[in-house]
Amino acid sequence: MTQNLVTKPFLEVLSGNRQASPPMWMMRQAGRYLPEYREVRAKAGGFLDLCFNAEFAAEVTLQPIRRFGFDAAIIFSDILVVPYALGRSVRFEVGEGPRLDPLDSPDKVSTLTKAIDLSKLQAVFDALRITRRELPPETTLIGFCGSPFTVATYMVAGHGTPDQAPARNMAYQHPGAFAKIIDVLVESSIQYLLAQLEAGAEVLQIFDTWAGVLPPREFERWSIEPTRRIVEGVRKVKPGTKIIGFPRGAGAMLPAFVERTGVDGVSIDWTAEPSFVREKVQSKVVVQGNLDPLVLIAGGAALDEAVDDVLKNFSGGRHIFNLGHGIQPETPIAHVEQMLKRVRAFKG
C-alpha cells in the first residue's frame, strides 16, 4: 500500500517551486509574546538554561507550530552558543543582554581556541531530534548560526553596542587579529551547522544581524566572504543543503551578497526597497520577509495594508512571508492571527 507523499511548502519554494500562497514563519516565533513560552522560561530559569535543556528547547520550538501552524520551525537557541563552545564565558544578564569576556586586543585574540567543542552543544542537537520527531510532517525544521561578523562583534566588545564600533575598530587597526576571530568562527560554524543537519535540521539560516554597519569594501570582506566559505564548507559535506542568508541592512550590497555567497534564499528587513529586490534579487533566489515587526504590534488596518503590500510586492516570484526581524515581546497574539489569516487567504 503506497502512502501519499507529504508536501513541505517551505522546502518546495527553496527547491525552485513557487507557491501561490507563500509559506510563512516568523523570526523569534518562539518567544515572550506567547504565555506558554513564558511558563517554560520560568521553569528553566536563565536564558541559557532554557537553550541547554533539550526538552524545554524543543517544547518552545514546537509551541508556535501548535498555535499557528507555521510552515517552518526554527530550533530555539542563540547565536552565542558558538563562542560558548569555543570556551568563552557567555552569560545573559537580566535587562542587559549578553555578556562575554571581551577579545579587545591582539594579545587576547591569541588566546582564542581554534577548535569548537561540539559536546558542549549536545543539548541543541538533542532538541533538534526531539523537535523533528514531534513536528507535523509538512513542517520544515530550520537550524541556524550567527554570521562570523555578527558573532565577532559580541566577542570583541563583550556585549552588544549600537554601531559595533569596537569590532569595526579592531578590523581597521588590527585586521590580522580580527581575521583570526573570523576564521575560527567560519570553521566552527561549518562544524556546528553540519551537526545540526545530522540531528534533523532540514534548512539552515545564517543571521548577519549587524552586516548593515559595514561599508561596501568591508561588507565584502567580513560579511560576504565568510558566509560564502560557510555555504561552501557545508555543501562540500552535504551537497544540496538549502541555506538562507540574512544580511540585515545590506541595502545596495544585497545583489552582491546573493551572487557571491551561493545562498538559496535571502531574508530582507523592512527597509529594503521592493522594486530593487524584485529586479536584482528575486529572479535568482527566494526572498524572505519583510513585514515591519512594529506594524504587527499596531494591528488593525495598518497591519492589513502592510501585509498586503508585502504579498503584492513579492508575488511575482518565489517568496517566504516573514518579518523583517524578530517579533517583539509586546506583540498581541490576536495580531499574529490577523496576519496569518491574511497571508493564508492570499493567492498570488
Swiss-Prot record:
Supply the SUPFAM superfamilies for this chain. UROD/MetE-like (SSF51726)
Q: Which GO terms describe its cellular component?
A: cytosol
Task: Supply the alphabetized keyword list.
Answer: Cytoplasm, Decarboxylase, Lyase, Porphyrin biosynthesis
Q: Which reaction does it catalyse?
A: uroporphyrinogen III + 4 H(+) = coproporphyrinogen III + 4 CO2
Name the Pfam families on file. URO-D (PF01208)
**Subcellular location(s) per record:** Cytoplasm
> Any idea what job this protein has?
Catalyzes the decarboxylation of four acetate groups of uroporphyrinogen-III to yield coproporphyrinogen-III.
Query: Could you say which protein family the record assigns here?
Result: Belongs to the uroporphyrinogen decarboxylase family.
Name of the featured protein: Uroporphyrinogen decarboxylase
* Taxon lineage: Bacteria, Pseudomonadati, Pseudomonadota, Alphaproteobacteria, Hyphomicrobiales
- Name of the gene: hemE
